[in-house]
Amino acid sequence: MSIYPMYTRKITHWFARRSFQNRIFLLILFTSTIVMLAMSWYLTDITEERLHYQVGQRALIQAMQISAMPELVEAVQKRDLARIKALIDPMRSFSDATYITVGDASGQRLYHVNPDEIGKSMEGGDSDEALINAKSYVSVRKGSLGSSLRGKSPIQDATGKVIGIVSVGYTIEQLENWLSLQISSLLIPMAIMLLLLLFCARRFSLHIKKQMLNMEPQQLSQLLIQQSVLFESVFEGLIAIDSDYKITAINQTARRLLNLSQPEPTLIGKRISSVISQEVFFYDAPQTNKKDEIVTFNQIKVIASRMAVILNNEPQGWVISFRSKDDINTLSLQLSQVQQYADNLRAVQHEHRNLISTIAGLLFLKRYNQALELIQQQSESHQKVIDFIARNFQDNHLAGLLIGKYYRAKELGLELIFDPACFVDRLPTALSHNEWISIVGNLLDNAYNASLRQPQGSKQIECLINSDGQEVIIEIADQGCGIDEALRDRIFERGVTSSASKDHGIGLWLVRSYVEQAGGSIVVENNIPFGTIFTLYIPLTRDEHHG
């Protein structure tokens, strides 16, 4: 069994156990090292080739210059070894060549750096081209001093006859020393480059880790799968858009609520304005989050929120969540009929209990006439109010609300007075019964609370509701505590209230939302001497170009 596959598996297993950040770092380090080694090999090869060429040309030029010296030609012709030595020794001392050799026409040495070699034949077998063909050239051969790079040139007399040869050589060992010096000069820059690559690799791996939220790929993959399942499983419609207002994600609930038949891939990349016909909500105040606003998406009333995705203090996109208004019960149930009817029934029960107790006391005292008179008085008073409401308010939901609010006022020690001009035979088409009752109920509740907080004012609340003409007019006047000037401009904002209770701050915001939805307007004035007058103008038929 080969050890190589086993060793490879161990390395692979060890590498797989490293964190993603370290794997990226090691991979870049390995790749960088391979590249650096390849570059080193290439530079070494190029440098060696260039060095051999340059040194070879240097040896050749020296050999040609020496062989052309008239003094040397004359000395070789006379075989004057002393003269040859006197000519060559100074040159060798100034040259960087390892050796300079001079031979005769038969290749026997006339001069050599080693005197013992004089008279012997030149080694290497590469002198024939110079001696026979009178050529100058560069060769690499092994001689008496070892392998060397040598330049050879013939010595010719005045007639052109070859009478000798000059060989200038550089040993391979000397060339390798020079090559090592040149390569070593590159080691520091290459080491600096390698360290820079290591630093960049580390920074890059840290950047990748940061971009992946410090998670491993499998963790990120699992998170994306979980978020995808969560995105599709919530009951709210969810839409994600980028900074160019193009859809990047939309869940199944959103497509169902908006009656969109296209699958998600078809909607991805489309501008939100081409899919949903409510542009103000998406484009208004891009850096501000919106929460629980009543808007209309594709002619469907929804309660929507918008959350900005902020990166480097700039919005990179938004996530819009919404639910059909018909499905929202948290606000409507608390601010409309369920809570109101419970309060109204308690008020009626409380007043009837007090009345029965009073009548029982009169009967016990045998004051029958006074008991009968009280019964008739209460019956006439209540009947007048009930008859007035039944006659002037033809919507049963509104009539029931007003009767309950009348008894609730009496329970609180207040008096709800209806203006004789009250008359409602139709309601705005843009509002449902629930929304309409929420408007009136919240205005009356607000007036009750304000009146209870003002000990000096009258305890009367005046109510006018009239649908004559093209709009419904609602006017609620109280003698309560009024509106703080610091809150007057913000009284209709969600969560803004002058009450200490955490449950307040929603009613007037809801009133404004419904009125604006129906294309109406609200006027707030100070009452004299105390209190506030709220006047609402709501068109019976909504102007489609409004808002």
From Swiss-Prot:
Residues 45-180 are periplasmic. GO terms for cellular component: plasma membrane. The chain crosses the membrane at residues 24-44, 181-201. It is an enzyme of class 2 (transferase). It comes from the Bacteria. Residues 347-542 form the Histidine kinase domain. The modification Phosphohistidine is found at H350. PROSITE patterns: HIS_KIN (PS50109). Residues 1-23, 202-547 are cytoplasmic. Its EC number is 2.7.13.3. InterPro entries: HATPase_C_sf, His_kinase_dom, PAS, PAS-like_dom_sf, sCache_3, Sensor-like_sf, Sig_transdc_His_kin-like_C, Sig_transdc_His_kin_SpoOB. Keywords: ATP-binding, Cell inner membrane, Cell membrane, Kinase, Membrane, Nucleotide-binding, Phosphoprotein, Transferase, Transmembrane, Transmembrane helix, Two-component regulatory system. CDD domains: HATPase_DpiB-CitA-like (cd16915), PAS (cd00130). It is found in: Cell inner membrane. One of its GO terms (molecular function) is phosphorelay sensor kinase activity. Changing H112A: Strongly reduces citrate binding. It catalyses: ATP + protein L-histidine = ADP + protein N-phospho-L-histidine. This is Sensor histidine kinase CitA. It comes from Klebsiella pneumoniae. The lineage of its organism: Bacteria, Pseudomonadati, Pseudomonadota, Gammaproteobacteria, Enterobacterales.
